């Protein structure tokens, strides 16, 4: 994936054609949201001419700037600067208007609020080439999990209300949301050991992705085929990759796992250099026993 605009500053598009020729399969400015609709329209129109996928972060930066939590009971009780769920809806509706104008292939990286879902559903019903994702954290945690300003739970967008979390689970189940992502965002210890408002957002998630997802399975929200469709097949299809499926001639990228294996999450056992997981100390189920990439075994769990 390559940047959509130079320096990801939202003002001038990158050399999308050259980057695509070099192997870029999608274009995004990640968390940075441009307020220059004309610049983004030009970038989308050019991406459309090349059949490229544009990935955006639906958010109104004017409303969300400086926020550390979602507006609601928790932020009010703790006195934390908060962002309204309307910021996500407004950002998404702007993006979808530009998609309608340009016809570009579009993916919303994180939908986390119930208020954004109607706009997404309308766009799909209208035949726009749009997909959307949400993170495993927004499917399994809510605003009150932050507790006493626990910075490992500070993510972007912030954790939402329980009503929003349940709405996201239902949206994955009915296909309104296509992709569940890890949104793996490492942060060093020093950037997390700060007052909540000053701490860096983000959480490591690659190693906790599967056991966290198993919470949805064990709670009866999603069966395994639906879960892995959203975690593997749908993102691979959207990116035009051959992975994410068990099929003849498909890459043998496989995992062997026990969905019921219980364990206590200890962040110091993570292989990642960063240890900022919100699941530290949590009782979890679902262990990866072995991993193959391209038919070669690259991991085996300790017995």
PLM features per residue range, with description:
Residues 1-12:
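Metal-cofactor-binding active-site regions of metalloenzymes
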Residues 131-134, 182, 208, 291:
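Ser/Thr-centric signal marking residues that sit
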Residues 77-105, 152, 173-174, 178-180, ...:
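His/Asp/Glu-enriched, well-ordered alpha-helical/loop segment
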Residues 195-198, 251-303:
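C-terminal cap of metal-dependent C-N hydrolases
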Residues 37, 64, 117, 140, ...:
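Glycine/Thr-rich phosphate-binding loops of Rossmann-like dinucleotide-binding domains
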Residues 11-180:
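Histidine/acidic residue-rich metal-binding segments in metalloenzymes
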Residues 113, 137, 185-187, 261-262, ...:
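Short, glycine-/Ser/Thr-/acidic-enriched flexible segments
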């Amino acid at each position: 994936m390559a940047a959509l605009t130079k320096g990801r500053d939202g003002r001038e598009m990158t050399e999308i054609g050259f980057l695509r020729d070099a192997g870029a399969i999608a274009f995004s400015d990640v968390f940075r949201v441009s307020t220059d609709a004309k610049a983004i329209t030009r970038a989308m129109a050019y991406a459309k001419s090349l059949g490229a996928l544009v990935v955006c972060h639906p958010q109104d930066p004017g409303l969300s700037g400086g926020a550390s939590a979602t507006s609601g009971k928790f932020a009010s009780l703790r006195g934390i600067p908060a962002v309204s769920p309307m910021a996500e809806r407004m950002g998404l509706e702007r993006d979808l208007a530009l998609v309608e104008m340009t016809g570009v292939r579009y993916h919303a990286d994180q939908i986390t609020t119930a208020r954004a879902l109607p706009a997404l559903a309308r766009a799909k019903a209208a035949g726009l080439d749009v997909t959307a994702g949400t993170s495993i954290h927004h499917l399994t945690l809510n605003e009150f999990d932050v507790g006493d300003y626990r910075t490992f739970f500070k993510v972007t967008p912030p954790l939402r209300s329980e009503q929003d979390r349940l709405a996201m689970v239902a949206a994955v189940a009915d296909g309104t949301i296509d992709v569940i992502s890890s949104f793996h965002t490492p942060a060093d210890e020093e950037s997390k050991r700060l007052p909540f408002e000053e701490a860096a957002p983000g959480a490591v998630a690659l190693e906790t992705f599967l056991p966290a997802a198993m919470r949805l399975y064990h709670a009866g929200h999603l069966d395994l085929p639906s879960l892995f469709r959203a975690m593997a097949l749908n993102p691979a299809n959207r990116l035009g990759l051959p992975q994410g499926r068990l099929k003849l001639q498909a890459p043998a990228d496989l995992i062997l796992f026990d969905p019921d294996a219980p364990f206590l999450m200890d962040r110091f056992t993570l292989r990642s250099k960063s240890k900022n997981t919100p699941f530290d100390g949590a009782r979890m189920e679902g262990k990866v026993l072995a991993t193959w990439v391209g038919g070669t075994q690259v991991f085996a769990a300790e017995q």
